[in-house]
Amino acid sequence: MADSKLKIDIRRDRILEQLRQKGKILVSELSRELGATPVTIRNDLDALERDGYLVRIQGGALLRARPSVEWRGEQETIAHLAEKQAIAQAVAAQIPDGSTLFLNSGTTSQCLANALRAHRSLNVVTNSLAVATELGRQPLIHVILLGGEINTQYGFTYGSDAEEQLRRYQAGWAVLSVDGVSARGGVTSFHAEETAIDRMMIAHAKHTIIAADYTKIGRTGFTHICDASPEIQLITNSPCSPEAIHDLELLGVSATIV
C-alpha cells in the first residue's frame, strides 16, 4: 500500500532534522532508523533535493550550503507552504488592529508576518530576523527585534540578553510556530536555545495561539515549551490526526482546523 501523504511528510521532516543536525546522512542509516526501505529513502532524498534542501551524493545526501549572510526563509523553500499560509490567514483574522503580539521564529511565523502586513497600529515583538525584516517594512506596524545571540542557520536571536529585554513587555497575543503538539508531550521544539524565549512569550501574553501544520500534530520535539491545556488555542490544518486532536481537546485545548 502506498504511503499516505501524512506519513511521507513526517518521514521527510525527520530526514531534514537529521540532516540539519549532522550535515550528512546515509541511506542505510535512515532506512534502519525510520523503518523504510532504501528505495523509499532514496525517493525521499530525490524529492528533497528538488525542493532545494539537500545535495545528493552516493549513498546519501549533504545539507545544501548557503551563504552566511542568509537566514532561513529569506531564500529557502518553505515546506508545506500552502498549508502554512492558510494557517497564517486564520491566525491573522483573530488579531485586531492595534494589538501587541509576540512572534517567535519559524516558517509559519514568517507566513504570519506576510498575512499581517495589511494590519494597522500593530506592535510586534519578535526574535525572528525574517519576521522583523518583513513587518519592519510596513509603516503602520511597529517592530521590536529582541537583541542577543544569533542562530545564523535559522535566523533567530536567543540568550540572556534577549530574555532580559523580553521581560519588559506584555502582549495581548503570543503566536508560536512550533515543532510538535501532542497530549502527552505538550508543545515542543527542536531548538533548545529558543525554548526560554517561547516560554516567556506565553507567560507575558493574555492569549496564546500555537500555529502548527498537520505534520506537527501528535509529534513530540526535543524540548518542552508548555503543557497542552485550556490556555492554548491550536490552529492547524487537514489532514491532521483526528486521534491526536481528540486527545488534545480532552485536555481543554481549543483546536481549529483550517
Language-model region placement:
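Conserved phosphate- and dinucleotide-binding cores of soluble alpha/beta proteins
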Residues: 2-13, 17-30, 35, 50, ...
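Glycine-rich beta-strand-to-loop/alpha-helix junction loops that act as flexible
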Residues: 104-106
